[in-house]
C-alpha cells in the first residue's frame, strides 16, 4: 500500500490521539478527574450517531439527584478500577430507575453492574463510596444515535422488583465461555439480549496481560463493529501500555498492518477484512491492554455472520445466549 493510500485508509478507518479524547475540563462531573476516552460514531466514522465513553470516577458523585430523563436509549456499565478483575467494584453505587417521577426505584450494588436505560426513562447514578483513590471506578456509557434502531421495551413484567430486569451485575457480566484462553483475567461482556432488548448491540472488555495473538487469521463480518484498544493508565488514556499490530484491508490481497502504541479505535465496516491482532509487547501485566469490541448487528455471533480467509473458523461454536 502506497503512503498516500495508507493515509487515506487511516483517515477512513482509524482514530487515535486527541481525536479520541474528551479533556477532563469538559467532563460533566468534577469527580471525573482524568481525560475520557471517547468513540464518536460520527458521519465520517461509521455514521451511526451516538457515542461510547470510557472514563474514571475518582470521588463519590450523585449525578442526577432529581433523576434525569434519558433522551436516547443507553447502556451504562460501572466496573471496578482494577483491570486485573473488573468484576470487583471496590466501592458502592445506587442506581435509580423509573418510567415516571412517581415510580422511582433505587437499587444498591457493591459489585460491578450494567444498566439498560430505555428512551424516556428516568435514571440516576449515585456513586456513594470508592474504597481507594488508587482504584477509581471505571465508567462506560454507550448512547444510541438516531440511526441506531431503538429497541422495543425490555421484555418481562414489572412484578415486585421488576425493574431489576434492566440491571445485570457481578458474575453475570463475566464472559466465561470466551474462546481466548490466553486471556487470564476476567473478560466482561454486556449485550442487549441479556436485558431482553431487541436491538443487537454488544460490547466486550478483554484485558490482555501477556504478549500473544488473538484471532490469528484474517476474516470479515456481515455486521458493523468497532475494534478498540486502550490502556489502563487513568493519568493518560492515550498510553496503550504496549504495542499492538492489527491487520486490516478492503480486500484479502491487500492487507495492511497498523502498529500502534497509543490507544486507538478502528471502524470495521461489514465486509472489511481484519486480523490477526498481535499483542507484541505488554509493559506491565498488572496494567493490561484492553481489547474492546463494540458490535452493531442482527444475528451477531451466528456462524453465518463471519467469513474466514481460508473458510475455517479457529474457534468452537459459541453457546447460545441466555
Model-derived features with residue positions:
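Extended extracellular/luminal ectodomain segments enriched in beta-structured repeat modules
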Residues: 71-74, 222-225
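Conserved metal-binding segment of the jelly-roll/cupin
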Residues: 99-129, 252-280
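A short, N-terminal "cap"/entry segment at the start of jelly-roll beta-barrel domains
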Residues: 1-67, 151-218
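A short beta-strand-loop-beta hairpin characteristic of the jelly-roll/cupin
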Residues: 78-110, 229-261
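Double-stranded beta-helix
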Residues: 2-18, 22, 126-175, 238, ...
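Short, flexible loop/turn elements at secondary-structure junctions
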Residues: 79-81, 121, 230-232, 264, ...
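Short acidic (Asp/Glu) patches
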Residues: 59-62, 97-102, 119-121, 211-213, ...
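Extended, hydrophobic interaction surfaces within ordered domains
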Residues: 53, 112-120, 135-143, 202-204
